[in-house]
């Protein structure tokens, strides 16, 4: 087993699945993505939203590691066609890039496939060298969250630009190790979500 100093030298975490060995690759997020970009709010704002059609994802729909779809908006086919460049695909990584929720990230699910995003949500579409779920989880780590905060230099409104997002420092293991890490974190998140729902039910009974 590698010592603490050896782990630092090899650029690997101090806790690791025992069957994996070797150094993790250092790279920038831009090297792992085929798309980094956001959308825009349709002309007319809320007035153009419909009750069905293409999902329109806003920053309030992106939680930390999960989507919040109870108040999802919709746009019609005509509006969608005007924003075709921001069409969502399943497993796109969604990142909030402005305001108080900056840094929150979640994976696009089948439920919002074919939808669009506004200007406050960035789409990160990974290439075949990295698992989208791994990138989504990695952005949630304290390392990247602190990096995001370090990029905010005053002003009345926080924000990330695409160049800054592409500069995120990412350490990646083999795809096999990425998948195992992502599965473990997904299981943990599911249990946290279950416990949160139980707490909400108990609190509603107490009121």
Residue ranges of predicted features:
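Non-catalytic DNA-recognition/assembly elements of restriction-modification systems
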Residues: 14-40, 167
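Specificity-determining recognition surfaces
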Residues: 45-48, 55, 138-170
């Amino acid at each position: 087993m590698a010592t603490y100093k050896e782990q630092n030298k090899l650029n690997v975490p101090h806790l690791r699945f025992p069957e994996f060995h070797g150094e993790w690759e250092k790279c920038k997020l831009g090297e792992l993505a085929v798309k980094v970009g956001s959308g825009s709010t349709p002309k007319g704002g809320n007035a153009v939203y419909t009750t069905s059609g293409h999902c329109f994802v806003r920053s309030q729909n992106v939680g930390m590691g999960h989507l919040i779809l109870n108040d999802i908006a919709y746009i019609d086919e005509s509006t969608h066609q005007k924003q075709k460049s921001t069409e969502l695909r399943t497993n796109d990584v969604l990142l909030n890039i402005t305001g108080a929720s900056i840094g929150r990230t979640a994976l696009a699910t089948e439920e919002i496939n074919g939808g669009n995003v506004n200007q406050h949500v960035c789409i990160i579409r990974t290439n075949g060298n990295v698992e989208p779920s791994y990138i989504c989880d990695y952005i949630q780590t304290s390392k990247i969250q602190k990096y995001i905060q370090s990029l905010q230099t005053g002003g009345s409104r926080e924000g990330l630009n695409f160049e800054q997002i592409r500069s995120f420092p990412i350490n990646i293991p083999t795809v096999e190790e990425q998948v195992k890490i992502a599965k473990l974190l997904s299981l943990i998140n599911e249990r946290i979500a279950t416990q949160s729902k139980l707490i909400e039910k108990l609190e509603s009974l107490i009121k």
